[in-house]
Each structure stands twice: as C-alpha cells, then as structure tokens.
Regions:
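Short "lid" loop at the C-terminus of a central beta-strand within the Rossmann-like core
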Residues: 12-14
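Alpha-amylase-like alpha-glycosidases and glucanotransferases acting on alpha-linked glucans and related
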Residues: 16-176
Length: 176
C-alpha cells in the first residue's frame, strides 16, 4: 500500500548462546563434554533464561585476559555439562555471544535450510551475515582441520579430519 518492504538479517552460521536451538537441539552445535583448555573456569553470572539450563561464559571473557572459545552449559536437573564452541570466522576473536552450529551434522544442515526457506517465505530480501563461513572449505579450515595443521580455532586440532572423510560427511556445498 505504501511501497514499504522489509528485509531480514539472518546469520546462518551460529545462534545466540541463549537461543532456543541451544536448549532444544544441542546436537546441532559443536560441543564436547570436556573443556578444551583445563585452565578455563566458568564462575561468572548465569546467562540462561531457561529454567533447565545454566549458561556461563569463560572467566577470561570478563577480565579480558584471553579469548574464550567455549561457553559452559549445565543441566540443572541431571548435572550434564557441555562446552559449546562460540562462532568464529578465524580472522579475529571468537564471537562470545554465539553458539557455533555443526555443519558436519546433516540434521543441522537440513534445519538451517528449512529456517532459511521459512525466512524467505516471509521476507522479499534476506541479508546473510557471516555467510562465507558456510562454504565447505571454511567449515573444514575452522572446525575440522586437516591432520597436522592445527586449524584456525584453538581447541579444534584434536577434531582433525582427512579430506576424504570430510568430503564423505559433507559431500556437496549444501547452501547452494
């Protein structure tokens, strides 16, 4: 009627550390049940709004002495602990308010595709922030580095994967 159109700004690389998917679909995220660095501590404020989970940033975030690569989630009922990696493009510090999606998981890829399609049905224009990190070469470089390379994200070298295995797990560029 007035010629106004809305655009959506979507970040398909990661979610917020307190996003619904973090609680409802923990398998969508790059996480592990131990801290990537034994010296990391998580004694700061609980940032969770979910009554079932506690979410804490690594303490060095607050005193600015290190760039924490994970945050800790603790289930208040079972005591289960997960260390979830923050989003990162490998060029600067981790994005400490984010949780990194695991694109090696085909269920995650499909969930993101469906979310993109949902947004596309509601907005004529979509801006994708951090979209370059969805390319296979960046997923490999950042999160599943080749053996012996160390990778661009601290704490991920032990998750290295040879090219053949990586290509088997992500056979094609899923986002095209």
């Amino acid at each position: 009627k007035r010629g106004i159109r809305l655009a959506s700004d979507m970040v398909p690389n990661h979610t917020g550390i307190d996003g619904n998917w973090v609680y409802e679909h923990p398998e969508y995220f790059i996480s592990q049940d131990y801290s990537p660095f034994p010296s990391y501590t998580y004694n700061g404020p609980d940032l969770s709004t979910n009554p079932d989970w506690e979410v804490k940033l690594e303490d060095h975030y607050y005193d600015r002495t290190d760039a924490a690569v994970t945050f800790r989630m603790r289930n208040r009922h079972t005591g289960e602990i997960r260390y979830v990696f923050h989003g990162n493009d490998g060029t600067t510090m981790p994005w400490n308010d984010t949780a990194q999606l695991d694109y090696l998981n085909p269920v995650t890829r499909e969930a993101v595709i469906q979310k993109i399609l949902h947004v596309a049905r509601n907005f004529p224009i979509i801006r994708f922030d951090a979209a370059m990190t969805l390319a296979k070469r960046h997923i490999e470089r950042l999160w599943y580095p080749k053996p012996g390379t160390g990778g661009d994200i601290a704490g991920r070298a032990e998750h290295s994967m040879d090219e053949r295995e990586f290509n088997k797990r992500i056979p094609e560029e899923f986002w095209r």
